[in-house]
Amino acid sequence: PTMIFGDLCDHNISKFIRMFDKLPIMPEIDHGAGPIQPVNARDLGQAYYKAATHGSLPQLEYICWGERPVTVHELCALIGKYLGKKTRFVSFPMGFGVFLAKVLKAVTFGKKDYVEKMLRLGEDRSFSHEAASRDFGYVPDSFNEGLKREVEEYMKHGK
C-alpha cells in the first residue's frame, strides 16, 4: 500500500490533518480528483495475522487496501468536517503545480523536492483487495470511521 494511516505518526493523512487545521484555504490539484485508497494500519495488522494463520494460500502476494477509493477532495472535505472547520479549496491545474514544485526545487538547490509528490496527486492509487477478501477473509474497517478516529486523536493529543 502507498498510503497507510491510523495514528499521528503515519506521515500521510496526519499531514493533511495538520495542514487543514493550520491553513484557512486548502490548495488542491485538478479539483482533488485523484483517487486514493488509504489503508488503516489496524486493517493491515489483521490482514497479516489472518494470512499468517490461515495455512496455505493460493498466492504469495496480496493487495490489502482500505475499504474504498476516495478522491483527495473527499478526503480533505471529511477532515474539515471532522475538525469542525469550514472547508475552502483553491484548485490549480497539475501542470501549474508541477511548475511551482520545480521552481521550489531550483531555488532551494534541490533541498525541497516536491515534484514527485505533486505528480502522485494525479495518479489513480486505488486497487481491488478482492483476492485477499476471498482467500483469507480480509475486510477493512470503514474509511470514514478510521479517519474520524485519527482526527479525534489529533484534536486530543496532536495540537
Labelled PLM ranges:
Residues P1, W65-G66, E123:
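A secondary-structure boundary/capping signal
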Residues P1-D7:
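Conserved beta-loop-beta element that borders a ligand/cofactor-binding pocket
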Residues K50-D113, H129, D135-K159:
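Mid/C-terminal beta-alpha module of Rossmann-like enzyme folds, strongest
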Residues D7-D10, G32, Q37-G45, E61, ...:
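Conserved loop-to-helix N-cap of the C-terminal "lid" that shapes the substrate pocket in Rossmann-like
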Residues R18-V39, A47-A51, G55-S56, I63:
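A conserved pocket-lining segment of Rossmann-fold NAD(P)-dependent short-chain dehydrogenase/reductase
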Residues I13, I25-A41, V103-S126:
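Low-complexity, charge- and small-residue-enriched intrinsically disordered regions
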Residues P1, H31, V90-F92:
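Conserved beta-strand termini and adjacent loop/short-helix elements that scaffold enzyme active sites
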